[in-house]
Regions:
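Short, polar/flexible loop-turn hinges at active-site or ligand-entry regions and domain interfaces
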Residues: 188-194
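Conserved "right-hand" nucleotidyltransferase catalytic core of DNA-directed polymerases
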Residues: 1-150, 160, 165-167, 174-177, ...
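A generic local secondary-structure boundary/capping motif
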Residues: 156-158
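Feature representing long, continuous alpha-helical segments
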Residues: 153, 178-179, 183, 202-203
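Generic long, charged, amphipathic alpha-helical segments
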Residues: 196-210
Length: 210
């Protein structure tokens, strides 16, 4: 508890200038995508409206509807993934959504919670929220900063150490809950699997399915 309290009070530095520049870059690219989507659609519409987007894709452009909901055509990520290559507008919409998410959730979201006095982000770390006992983070969720895309990784670079004498280290335990369980239960099969760097899920499946 003491460590988490110290983390929350101390906070983490973020390069506000770099974050603002990144946000402006996203804004510029998002505007380019909006104009290109309008051009490909032949008209302006609310790209963020699934209903309006569905009409454009499946009625005006004649693409085959993959899935329907009670309110109309589904335009979720799975649907767009299946439509890739069918029309150039699909890739533009997918990129638009990715960048809009980065801009609103992370750039704007992080900027909004930078403490005006410390210049840091003071996320709340909670120890008793998750069922498994894993630490959770809110306001903002510092455990959910994007990493899978190149732009997401760029965003991570904006969190900076105290000064040039320090570095930030990113470490992640491998299957920590199952390792603790194996130790507490003294499960010989699990312990052997972990010691031999085996895939514990494959070992479990082989035990269950024979």
């Amino acid at each position: 508890v003491g460590v988490l309290a110290d983390m929350q009070i101390y906070g983490i530095r973020i390069d506000r200038k770099q974050l603002n520049e990144f946000s402006e870059m996203l804004d510029g690219r998002i505007n380019e995508l909006v104009n290109e989507i309008y051009r490909l659609a032949g008209e302006e519409f609310n790209i963020n409206s699934p209903k309006q987007l569905g009409v454009i894709l499946f009625e005006k452009l004649g693409l085959t509807a993959v899935k329907k909901t009670k309110t109309g055509y589904s335009t979720n990520a799975d649907v767009l993934e299946k439509l890739k290559g069918k029309h150039p507008i699909i890739e533009e919409i997918m990129e638009y959504r990715q960048l809009a998410k980065l801009k609103s959730t992370y750039c704007d979201g992080l900027s909004a919670v930078i403490n005006s006095k410390t210049g840091r982000i003071h996320s709340q770390f909670k120890q008793t929220v998750t069922v498994t006992g894993r630490i959770s983070s809110t306001e903002p969720n510092m455990q959910n900063i994007p990493v899978r895309t190149s732009l997401g990784r760029e965003l991570r670079k904006m969190f900076i150490a105290e000064n040039e004498d320090y570095v930030l280290v990113d470490a992640d335990y491998s299957q920590i809950e199952l390792r603790v369980l194996a130790h507490i239960a003294d499960d010989k099969t699990m312990i052997k699997a972990f010691c031999n760097n085996e895939d514990i899920h494959a070992v479990t499946a082989s035990q269950v399915l024979g």
